[in-house]
Amino acid sequence: MRALQLLVLVLSGLVGAQQQALMDYLERRLLAIEDRISLWHEQTSRYASELREFKQQMVAQLEGLDKSKEALRSELDTVGTRVDRVEREMDYLETQNGAQPCVDVDDKLVEQQVTFVKERNKAKYAKLTDCSDMISSIKAMKILKRVGGAKGMWTKDMGSATGKVYILNGTDDNTVFEFGTVREFTSSQGTSGATTIQLPSAWRGMGHAIYNNHMYYLKQGEEMKLIKFDLQKNIIVDSAVFPVKNQLPVYSLNPETFIDLAVDEEGLWAIYATQENERHISLAKIDPKTLDIQQMWDTPCVRENAEAAFVICGTVYVVYNSKLPSRSRIQCVFDVSDMVNNDEAPHVYFPKRYGTHSSLKYSPVEQLLYAWDDGYQILYKLQLKKKLEV
């Protein structure tokens, strides 16, 4: 009986040991499985993170490729336009400087060709709009602020109603200050609240124009090169040498300005002067897309004592003063449509101010003049009336 009890005790001990060994084995297996599951989670998270990073990189590269594609397309369009213009200029040069003939040319034939060119420049101007307004008087004047030096230019985008204001201080700089509105400009301390735009080259004079999100200006240098600069993309989209030789300062009281670009209801104009017609001011109509000259006129307006000019509905108004600043006045008018006679046009006097205008820019959207006078930014409200054909 005692032997049986001993046997039962031995068997019970063996069974308990086996159960403990089995439990230890199962625990080790569970721990191993948990470690593998944890490793799998870590690897899955890492792979998912790498996949997200790879996806973001691919999206960024695709966006960059799209931008590069658009930039390349824009550059190709610009190159195509320039090639077309170069071809036209080459045709013009070949026409003007053809090879010398091997035989004598009939003098009468030469005279006929010269007459043809002159008559083409005198051809009647084909108006783009039905605008027929002219100045009657200066209705009001408002002095907004004083910022910058004695000479400069301020303006809005004369081809749109964006409201942005642009400040260009001096006669040979490359920094443009952009304000969102006139109120932002007047309430800021100097130019501290402005967005700064750096041009790739310095301008010359004060005859710039801002038209349909582009700035048109004369590049600093001996060559009379017009630059068309995209204010949104901050790139030069076109340039062209102004096709006139021996240019002179267009205004004797502001000799820094050789070409004064103006905007009106008809588009973009250039006011300039040459040695060929040194006493008088000339006018040209410019294609704002290609910078091509569409038509040219010689005006009866003299350069002497002229300080600035602007264009309204195809009529150029030249403003005069004296070397000792007095009251500015519109003393000469030239209408490309021959509807306004200079002798019958009213002589309009500006209100008394500080000195002389270094620039006058007309806004066809607002019918206002943006003036720079000895560092003061001034607005003139114009009273207009209809032209009467003479």
Curated annotation (Swiss-Prot):
Compartment annotation: Secreted
Annotated glycosylation sites: N169
GO biological process, one term: signal transduction
UniProt entry tagged with the keyword Disulfide bond: yes
GO CC, alphabetical: extracellular space
UniProt xrefs under InterPro entries: Olfac-like_dom, Olfactomedin-like_domain
Coiled-coil parts of chain: 18-91
Family assignment from sequence similarity: Belongs to the OLFML3 family.
Annotated function: Secreted scaffold protein that plays an essential role in dorsoventral patterning during early development. Stabilizes axial formation by restricting chordin (CHRD) activity on the dorsal side. Acts by facilitating the association between the tolloid proteases and their substrate chordin (CHRD), leading to enhance chordin (CHRD) degradation.
Name the UniProt record assigns to this protein: Olfactomedin-like protein 3A
Species for this entry: Danio rerio (Zebrafish)
Lineage: Eukaryota, Metazoa, Chordata, Craniata, Vertebrata
